Amino acid sequence: MSTPLDHIRNFSIVAHIDHGKSTLADRLIQLTGGLDTREMKDQVLDSMDIERERGITIKAQTVRLSYKAKNGEDYVLNLIDTPGHVDFAYEVSRSLAACEGSLLVVDASQGVEAQTLANVYQAIDNNHEIVVVLNKIDLPAAEPERVKQQIEEVIGIDASDAVEISAKTGLGIEDVLEAIVNKLPAPKEGDRNAPLKAMLVDSWYDSYLGVIVLVRVIDGVLKKGQTIRMMGTGAKYPVERTGVFTPKMVQVDDLGPGELGFITASIKEVADTRVGDTITEDRRPTENMLSGFKPAQPVVFCGLFPVDAADFEDLRGAMGKLRLNDASFSFEMETSAALGFGFRCGFLGLLHLEIIQERLEREFNLDLITTAPSVVYRLNMTDGTHKELHNPADMPDVVKIASIEEPWIKATIMTPDDYLGAIMKLCQERRGIQIDLTYVGPRAMITYDLPLNEVVFDFYDRLKSISKGYASFDYNLSDYREGDLVKMSILVNEEPVDALSMLVHRSAAEKRGRALCEKLKELIPQHMFKIPIQAAIGGRIVARETISALRKDVTAKCYGGDVTRKRKLLEKQKEGKKRMRQFGKVEIPQEAFIQALKMGDD
């Protein structure tokens, strides 16, 4: 039996990293009896090892909570736990579209952070009702009154009746549940007898059940035995089971309007289940599709290569499996003269890249080399055509290019004002253009336009070290702008190394080239002949370092003072070295690649 609409609440929790939303979710599950004490562990919803170690949420998860409110009525609360990190904003947007309300969790000691803002604005765009929750009230540094005022000033929502809680100790959790019931709206229209219309919120792969699809039913009823059709892809499947997460999987007979649950339908490929698609019944389809989500656009690209070429097939299989779970990760094959066969992969951001790499190494035991991350450039050719450039090594001849456009981002940085000067200097070094600066109490909020190219290397690390970890950073893509960009190639022994080529701004090319050459000089071992390492832009060498040759003392066995004999031996050695240099191949160790690619503008 489905729950009546006015007793359902679909909500998500919006917060900055570390403000305690996964802990709050744990307490809500515990209080409503979703899991018994034995099954309870910290961060129940963060199911991946990486999520728990890093203390971040990557995949959005859902739970159905049953709650008997103080007014004696029974309510069904569907919680969608969302990631807070900027790279996973795509997951956030999907979760928010399936709900009607949000809990905004703010740390009472830290106040509003950059990512809180980004996610709250997304919730407001989705016309969500917002309940403010102040967490960590038990900390000595908590300043609830100051933070309430800050929320009103920065976000512009009324925080006077914010719920004050401590998710760690369980203080005030009941008040949160009451606020959800009383302040958040029930799902809008929904007709049980209308043709089935449901939104596909997420999908992931389970080795036993195939693809599990998370759905939010809007009209009609979804039950076992129906044949459903994905309106976007046209694929049809018979429904095998319907159920909900409590957070364990519990099968139910049917899912009615306003409800969130899962279905399995022997779907083999997650690619067939596009997030944001409309699910309807094949026999009696709905007239109009839902406006789907925007598909995630990869922002950062890099090459992933196996250290051992024999692992290539394993890597291909592993990537296919990750692609099953992560719709925003894309890859295609590529070959590199230096690194052999591998893949060119697209990611939503640097954290996404790190996590995919770590999951490949961890879950599939692969050793990988990552090439320098690059962004997508637009090339305007002289013949009037336009091209997208994902890999700097594929850049066409400069003569054919009229101009190059690069992606720019709008970055919001929140920082204590002590570090403001250093952060502004960092942004200016990275070609940033200041848009806005406002003060909220002792914290400053700066808005900058920055080229993404300058951010992908190590901007985030530098920002954190300059501000002793206090600054928070959030960005979204704004537009493409023309830039004076040049391709920098690295030549080792006069041979270009494709894996190290990159697009840089002309003004920074020399500095970047010199730093890279110096780094490679330390990393490449000496050979029997002299090795020049050069950074070149077009035909012009902008930096050079030389690794001196290992030298065998050929004159050691000469006694006596005959200088001509010595000279003859030295000349002969010189000839040999010259020939060796002509035909000799320089072995660049894998460590050298890894270290050189890690190098930022130190």
Swiss-Prot record:
Reactions this protein catalyses: GTP + H2O = GDP + phosphate + H(+)
What SMART domains does the record tag this protein with?
Answer: EFG_C
User: Where does the record say this protein resides?
Assistant: Cell inner membrane
Q: How does it sit in the membrane?
A: Peripheral membrane protein
Q: Where does GTP bind?
A: D18, H19, G20, K21, S22, T23, N135, K136, I137, D138
Which EC class, in a word? hydrolase
Q: Which residues form the tr-type G domain?
A: 6-188
The GO biological-process annotations, alphabetized, read as:
positive regulation of translation
The record's EC number reads 3.6.5.n1
Q: According to its UniProt record, which protein family does this protein belong to?
A: Belongs to the TRAFAC class translation factor GTPase superfamily. Classic translation factor GTPase family. LepA subfamily.
Name a single GO cellular component.
Answer: plasma membrane
Q: Which gene encodes it?
A: lepA
Query: A GO molecular-function term, please?
Result: guanosine tetraphosphate binding
Q: Which UniProt keywords apply?
A: Cell inner membrane, Cell membrane, GTP-binding, Hydrolase, Membrane, Nucleotide-binding, Protein biosynthesis
Q: Which HAMAP family match?
A: LepA (MF_00071)
Alphabetized Gene3D superfamilies for the sequence: 3.30.70.240, Elongation factor 4, C-terminal domain, Elongation Factor G (Translational Gtpase), domain 3, P-loop containing nucleotide triphosphate hydrolases, Translation factors
PANTHER family per record: TRANSLATION FACTOR GUF1 HOMOLOG, CHLOROPLASTIC, TRANSLATION FACTOR GUF1-RELATED
Organism expressing this protein natively: Brucella canis (strain ATCC 23365 / NCTC 10854 / RM-666)
**Protein function:** Required for accurate and efficient protein synthesis under certain stress conditions. May act as a fidelity factor of the translation reaction, by catalyzing a one-codon backward translocation of tRNAs on improperly translocated ribosomes. Back-translocation proceeds from a post-translocation (POST) complex to a pre-translocation (PRE) complex, thus giving elongation factor G a second chance to translocate the tRNAs correctly. Binds to ribosomes in a GTP-dependent manner.
Stated name of the protein: Elongation factor 4
